[in-house]
Amino acid sequence: MVNQKSLAFGQSKSSIREIAGYAAKRREEIGAENVFDFSIGNPSVPAPEVVRTSIEAAMKLPPQQVHSYTPAIGIFEAREAVALRRRFGSHAARANDLILTCGAAASISITLNSLVSPGDEVIVIAPYFPEYRVWIEHAQATCVEVLANPNTFQIDVERIRAAITSKTRAVIVNSPNNPVGAVYTRDNLEALAQVLHECSTKFGTDIYVISDEPYREIVYGDSEVPWIPDIYERTIVCYYYSKSLSLPGERIGWVLIPASNPEHDEVYAACAGAARLLGFVCAPSLFQRVLIDCVDEPTDVEAYAKNREVLTSGLTKLGYEYIQPDGAFYLWVRAPGGDAQAFCDIARQFELLPVPSDSFGCPGWLRVSYCVSYQTCVNSLFAWEKALAAIQ
């Protein structure tokens, strides 16, 4: 007899992965140019050249220096590079505030398991990345969905207040947001902080913010991504280079416990312990070393900005409604007819593959991942037109 929870997750795929798998199959059958795959957040922008040169330099080092086990929390030189060369709001970071991790799942799972106990509650702001629920439930906590403001998709702080109980241990904040592309304003985050302070006092508990920030550098125009630890001291930051450096397959990131956290040492030790318990010790050794050379490399946003422009312009002309994204590389489109899955079923006839929003906790929308080639965005518009005509 196997573990039934693991069996259930193994036998079911996320909607994102299911569509991505279907897209791969169709590319083999009819050619990549005929498939409009907007399913998965796999960056189309190449990794910076410095990544290649750094790998080549590392390969010239003695093999044991590159391929051996590292300290469980990551090599000091890489943690120090992140601490010294990244901007961390108004506070400096130290190497011993950071734990290097194996990407997103590791960063967030480590953080959750360091904070929650069985029966605790973790609030997610819907729409949200579906794997949050998986990671929360694996930590034996309850995932509590709270809808964002339906007009702006900013955090609805009064709904957050109403959802907080004596069991609330954390709120996951993802800005820029996947799947909407919303960037939470400073005023919005300050209002959230005020609610969390008031509810912590009311219930005699410590409520944490888990700030999930893989899209921090991918913003458009003059959008500002506030540094949440400057606003709320009990914040843990999760970051990884899948999006900013186009390294999703290399699984490298970090967890930051800011020095301003009043429980810093205890939380840091708990994160290190959670990494050990979950088997996430030793982020990839080679990419810890690459990180030293790349930590302050700028993100190429221009290609995503062009894709955003051609899609929003084209979909507007066709009559679609959407939320204008201020960051990340997702477009949140209202599903024609109101049923996201029904629209996606029709769109599939034209090889158009967005993701229905049901698993994001907010039915009636489509997530369009536009981190694809510019030509894919341009060529897809006829499929968007045909799908809309077919459902009307």
Residue ranges of each PLM-predicted region?
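Conserved glycine-rich beta-strand-loop-beta hairpin in the small C-terminal domain of fold type I
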Residues: S285-I292, Y304-T316, Y322-R334
